[in-house]
């Protein structure tokens, strides 16, 4: 039987950074609320959570890199909403933000979680920010907690 390594969902004693885009703030504020709810329900203290606001999703990877470089965080949660418009702008932003977040995570060996909604419409974004399709900010924070704990477990294995 293979060795199975899993981690729990306790945020107690862990430090979390949240980076949230202000663009489409009527969506991102709901994502932030969901993330904060997940973290506090899981035992994170208010003093263990840092919220950083950036202008838009495109700025998130640089902010995540700077946050990761401090060495103060066990996980970083990136939240934003990119909604398709009439031009190619959506495609470029989505591609670069996802690559940038992945690079920060790999370069720093740190869970940097992708909680960026990439939707075809405002309605889809609203659904994923706390209505029909749950709250992806909450889901992303739970994944961040699990990954932060997994990094600890793997460091001890």
Curated annotation (Swiss-Prot):
Give an example GO cellular component term for this record: cytosol
Picking any one GO biological process from the record gives: riboflavin biosynthetic process
Please name the InterPro entries in this protein's record.
LS, LS/RS, LS/RS_sf
Sequence positions that bind 5-amino-6-(D-ribitylamino)uracil: 23, 57-59, 81-83, 114
Q: Where does (2S)-2-hydroxy-3-oxobutyl phosphate bind?
A: 86-87, 128
For this UniProt record, the keywords arranged alphabetically read as follows: Riboflavin biosynthesis, Transferase
Name the active site residues.
89
Transferase in keyword set = yes
Q: In its UniProt entry, what is this protein called?
A: 6,7-dimethyl-8-ribityllumazine synthase
State the organism named in the record. Desulforapulum autotrophicum (strain ATCC 43914 / DSM 3382 / VKM B-1955 / HRM2) (Desulfobacterium autotrophicum)
């Amino acid at each position: 039987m293979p060795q199975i390594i899993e981690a729990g969902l306790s945020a107690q004693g862990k430090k979390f950074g949240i980076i949230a885009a202000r663009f489409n703030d009527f969506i991102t504020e709901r994502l932030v609320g969901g993330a904060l709810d997940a973290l506090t329900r899981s035992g994170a203290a208010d003093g263990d959570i840092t919220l950083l606001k950036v202008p838009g999703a495109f700025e998130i990877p640089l902010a995540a890199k700077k946050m990761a470089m401090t060495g103060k965080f066990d996980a970083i949660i990136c939240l934003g909403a990119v909604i398709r418009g009439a031009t190619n702008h959506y495609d470029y932003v989505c591609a670069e933000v996802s690559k940038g977040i992945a690079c920060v995570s790999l370069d720093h060996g740190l869970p940097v979680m992708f909680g960026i909604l990439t939707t075809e419409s405002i309605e889809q974004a609203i659904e994923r920010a706390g209505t029909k399709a749950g709250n992806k900010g909450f889901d992303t924070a739970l994944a961040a907690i699990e990954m932060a704990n997994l990094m600890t477990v793997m460091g001890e294995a």
